[in-house]
Curated annotation (Swiss-Prot):
5-amino-6-(D-ribitylamino)uracil binds at residues 23, 57-59, 81-83, 114. Its EC number is 2.5.1.78. It holds the Pfam family DMRL_synthase. HAMAP family: Lumazine_synth. The keyword Transmembrane helix does not apply. This is 6,7-dimethyl-8-ribityllumazine synthase. It comes from Rhodopirellula baltica (strain DSM 10527 / NCIMB 13988 / SH1). Catalyzes the formation of 6,7-dimethyl-8-ribityllumazine by condensation of 5-amino-6-(D-ribitylamino)uracil with 3,4-dihydroxy-2-butanone 4-phosphate. This is the penultimate step in the biosynthesis of riboflavin. GO terms for molecular function: 6,7-dimethyl-8-ribityllumazine synthase activity. CDD domains: Lumazine_synthase-I.
Length: 155
């Protein structure tokens, strides 16, 4: 049975929006640098990397919607960090943002790399933004790039 994937192949031309929260800045900044490195490593020139900063995770979806109003934006990478507090605030934010980002990707036909950390502790977030567990900025960017390559092959 023939199969295809997006691990190799050509990328379409266009801009990639990297939309990142300023909240929990040290964690998000590390993920931004990792995502930018992944894009550069994949051959996306710096002038095609559109970095958009938003206040927090809640605003990621709005910025994706605005970025996708530009026809030359071929995909987005969303980066943020929500750390559990004493209330259920984090659960509401995490669910709403996750659901909306998936809906935006499906509706627009453009991939959205999901780099929203949903951690119980600051230490967990640090470990996932360049620590022992890796960097979700790389993972979100690499997933979006793979989906762009797959999309190119499926057309």
């Amino acid at each position: 049975m023939p199969s295809i994937d997006g691990t190799t192949g050509n990328l379409p031309s266009g801009r990639v929006a990297i939309i990142a929260s300023r909240y929990n800045a040290n964690i998000c900044d590390s993920m931004v640098q990792a995502a930018l490195q992944s894009l550069s490593d994949a051959g996306i020139p710096e002038d095609k990397q559109w970095l958009i900063r938003v206040p927090g995770a809640w605003e990621l979806c709005w910025a994706v919607e605005q970025a996708f109003q530009h026809a030359d934006v071929i995909g987005a990478i969303t980066l943020g960090c929500v750390i559990k507090g004493e209330t259920t605030h984090d659960e509401h934010i995490n669910r709403a943002v996750s659901d909306t980002l998936m809906e935006q990707a499906v509706r627009s036909g453009r991939p959205v790399g999901f780099g929203l950390l949903t951690c119980n502790t600051v230490e967990q977030a640090i470990q996932r933004s360049g620590g022992a567990v890796g960097n979700k900025g790389h993972e979100a960017a690499d997933a979006m790039l793979e989906m762009l390559r797959l999309q190119t092959k499926m057309r």
